[in-house]
């Protein structure tokens, strides 16, 4: 798994997580899943399956930091127990701004590029070139 609930403790105190989640792991796991889905939507030019299946040191540290920020934002929206919402909102906005820059191509993170699937001629880059099928005219 790309991000675990225990890794959220670098961004939130454990008692805060316990209060909001009411001691169940379903709520933080749902926030993590939502954060990963949101990050994937911005990283369509990259191999998201490889990126988000990485574990440990194989993960991109900057992307991990921003996915944590997004997950914490989704998580703390459930309740504001001891949370500085302005700080969380700024960190969330910063993460989304970074993902948008990557999406536009202004930033080039150290992530694996997307490759073409076997048997499919789907475009890999931003532009797809092609032509119409050849026609034969008979009179």
Where are these regions (language model features)?
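Oligomerization/assembly interface segments of phage tail-like spikes and tubes
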Residues: 8, 69-73
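Core structural elements
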Residues: 60-70
